[in-house]
Amino acid sequence: MNTVRRAAATALAAVAVLGTGAVGQASAAAPSPTPSTGKLPAGLYGTKDPTYDGVWRQSLSFLAQRATGYQPADQAVEWLLGQQCDDGAFPSYRADATKPCDAKTMRDTNATAAAVQALAAVRRQSAAPEKADQAVKAGSDWLRSVQNKDGGWGYGAGGASDANSTSVVVGALAATGVRPTAFTSAEGRTPYDALLAFALPCSDKEGPGAFAYQPDKAGKLFANADATAAATLAGLGKSMVATKASPEQAPTCTDLSKPTSERAALNGASYLAKTLATTHHLVQPPMPGATDTAEQPDFGNTADAVVALSAAGASKEAMPALEWLEKNSAAWAKESGPAAYAQLILAARATETDPRKFGSVDLVEQLNAAGPAPKSPDTSASSTTADEEDSGFDLWWIIGIGTVVGVGIGFLLSGRKK
């Protein structure tokens, strides 16, 4: 999710907390929390106002650094740990972490899930592994406590479930080896039950196989590429640090009489492949009230789509988009900051592309320069921890599937990293 849309979603979550309604699709016209001011913390990545994305961009930076063999600086890890509330949740950003969280503190499910993934990736080589372990457990416990009856999560605690938030939580479960099917709501619903409710059938004329962000007020689903990229990864049981699955298999869309999360994920990959086939990039519509009404390239979600396609065994379909990003994303990444560099690094990793030679940009160098200098790669450990995040529950997931229509068990097993 791009920072501007995180800002809008955070604002809408604030509205929900105040009791004025449930969180819906992001809108820049919504009221927003007061942006932070003053000097930024020394341990934080990026130089822009972190009100809406401080924890998110820090977490993505950690994931990308571990994926390239670097261990984030202890100062940076300590900053992220300090953002956690006593109940285990993470807000989007706390300007003064010495003040305890209260009822007015905006707890952010996306930030919490991203932080859980990040801390799980760095904990073994951090200065305080036990502290990081405790933070991961507390974050996971909080996410369980705010799970909606339908099995999913909204952006803010208590908000209506959406595909993106539910997917990033599934990624956190993947990173910590927790089975999503064991993460059930009071009604006995799993995160996959929630995701399937957002999946469009292959017969849908506008978005066959896609996922919606949320149903509209009338309950109708509309294809959303951002949600589809996120839900495709989640349906495959993957975290944000996913890798290329092999052998290659062109994604197709198939409706089952009894839908499954993995089939829905492959249908999502089919939608992404078709959407990227012509321009090789996704687009974002103008935000409400914008003077420029033309669609613009969506660099961040294009990178996410590349990861999702590669994880689904469709790296051939992902490569044109990856090459488009190599040629066109430099200015966007420079303007957007560390989270953008991290997204591009994860896309490069998923397609086995060198992130140090990404077009004319060394993505690793640019990311590392955006915050405290990380520890140099340890060749004995390399990115082992990051690798483990990607395969947290692949084996039990495959065994639990039994039979998957259209996908051989050998194909699924070959997607494992170990």
Please identify what each model-predicted range represents.
Residues 2-418:
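Preference for long, amphipathic alpha-helical scaffolds in soluble/luminal domains
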